[in-house]
Amino acid sequence: MSVRIDEPQLFVSMSKEPTQETVNVGGHHDDSSSNCDERVDDQTEEQKSPPASPDLTANLNVFDLESRQKVVQRLLNSQLNLSNLRAPLNLPPIFQALQGPFSIQQQLLGLASGLTAISPGLDDYDEENTNQGEPEDLTLGGFRKETSVKSEEPSESGINASGPAWSYEEQFKQLYELSDDVKRKEWLDDWLNFMHRIGKPVTRIPIMAKQVLDLYELYRLVVQHGGLVEIINKKLWREITKGLNLPSSITSAAFTLRTQYQKYLYDYECEKEKLSNQSDLQQAIDGNRREAPGRRTAPSFPLPFQLPHAASAAATMLNNQLNGLGMRNDLLDDENTLSLQASGLFGTSYGAEQMAILEAHQRNLERAQRAVQQQVARQSLGLTACSNGNGGNIHNSGRESTSSNDSDIPAKRPKLENDVKTNGASSMRISTKHSDNSKTSMSVSMEINGITYQGVLFALDETVSES
C-alpha cells in the first residue's frame, strides 16, 4: 500500500518491511495497492489538504511519517500483541489498530497525535468518539441537575409557605373548610399570623376523636364562657364538648381540650381578650388538681361526729371482753395507730376547706382515747388496792401460793396468765391441804366471775429444781 502525499507525486511503499522502505518519484505504483491509493485519495480530497509544499518539506514529512509508523509498529507487536491480527485488506498497522477496541484506539491516537496533517481521518474518528461520549455525560449531569432542581422546588415553596406572606388556607385547608362561617377565614389568618409572630408557628392540626379539632369553634366557645381559667374553675368542659359535637364517650376529654387550648389558643386569648394571665391559669390548674375526682378516696361530705363515740364504744366493748381490767398497752397502741392512719388517710383525701372539720374530729377522737386510758388507769388503781387487801391471805400461803399463782392456768391459755394475776377484784377463794407423807401437796380452789377452778399442786424437790 502507498500513501499519496501531493504534487510532486511522492509515494511511500509500506507493503514491505520497515527496513526495505523506498521512495518513488513519479506517477506510477503497484497494482496491488491501487485500491488503497484510491481510498486515501478520496479521504484527502474530502479533507481538502493544503497546497503542495516544496520538495524538501515533503521529504521531511515523509521521513517523519516513517519514524512514527515504526513506533506504532513496535507498540502493536510488543505491548498490544496485535502482530497476529489480519485485516480483510492489507492495511498499514495504524489502520489495522483503528479497527480494534476503543481503549487501544485511544492509546494509539495518543501516540500518533502528530499525524493530523497527513492522515486527517484519524482526528475525525477521535473527535467522533469523543463527541459520542460527551453528550451522554452531559445529558446525565443535566438530568441530575434537573432532578435536583425539581426536588428543591417544593422545599423552596415550603420555605415560602412557612412565611407569613404565604396563604395559610392551602396548608390548613381542613380548618378553613369545617364550616361556612364568614369570620372563620379572617380569624384563622389572624391567629396563624399571630402564632408565627410570637415564634410558635403551627405545623400540624390537632386531631381528637379521629377528626380534626375545630380550633376556631373551640376558641369561640371558651371565650363565650369567660375564658380558659373560668372554664377550669367552674368545670364547664362538658358544655364545651357538646358545643364541639364530640362524642360523650371520650375519656379525659377535659384534659385533652385544656392541653390543646393551652398549647394553641391561650396565648391568642391573652393577647386579644385579656381574660386572664399565666399565673391565673397555673392557680386554676393547681386547684383543679387538688380537687380532682380521681384523687378522692372518701365522700365529699363532712365526717360524722359519731366517729369518736364509735371509737369509745369499741374501746368499751374491748374493756368488757377483758373484764374491764385487761386493756393492755399493745391494744391501746394498735388503736392509736389505726386512728392516726385513718386521720392521715382522710387528711390526704380531703381538700384544704375540709381540714378544719377533720382536725376537730381528730381532737374529739384524742379526747375519747384519753378518757379510755384514764378509765383503765383508775381500774388498775382499784385492782392494786384490792390486791393489797387480800395480800395477807395470799402471803400466808408462802412460796406455795406464789408458785400456784404462776402455774394455775392451763397450758392451752397462756395469754390469760397476766389476767389471772391482776384479776383480784373478782371473788377468789384458795384452800390448801397437806398430805401425810413427806412430800407436801396443796389443793387449790379458785372462783373467778362465778367459775370455779380447782387443782392440786405439789412441791418440787430442790434437786429437781436445780436440774
Swiss-Prot record:
GO terms for molecular function: DNA binding; sequence-specific DNA binding. Induction: By unc-86. Residues 1-56, 383-441 are annotated as: Disordered. Residues 356-464 form the REKLES domain. The keyword Transcription regulation applies. InterPro entries: ARI3A/B/C, ARID_dom, ARID_dom_sf, REKLES_domain. The keyword Iron does not apply. Residues 181-273 form the ARID domain. It comes from the Eukaryota. GO terms for biological process: cell fate commitment; cell fate specification; negative regulation of transcription by RNA polymerase II; neuron differentiation; neuron fate specification; positive regulation of transcription by RNA polymerase II; regulation of transcription by RNA polymerase II. One of its GO terms (cellular component) is nucleus. It is found in: Nucleus. Residues 421-430 have a biased composition (Polar residues). Residues 27-48, 409-420 have a biased composition (Basic and acidic residues). Its main location: nucleus. Present in IL2 and URA neurons, and in AVD and PVC interneurons. Present in muscles from head and pharynx (at protein level). Keywords: Developmental protein, DNA-binding, Nucleus, Transcription, Transcription regulation. Transcription factor. Regulates neuronal subtype identity. Involved in motor neuron fate determination and maintenance, acting as a transcriptional repressor to counteract gene activation by transcription factor unc-3 in a subset of motor neurons. Probably acts by binding to specific promoter elements. Promotes differentiation of URA sensory neurons and prevents them from expressing male-specific CEM neuronal features. Promotes differentiation of AVD and PVC interneurons and their glutamate receptor expression. This is AT-rich interactive domain-containing protein cfi-1.
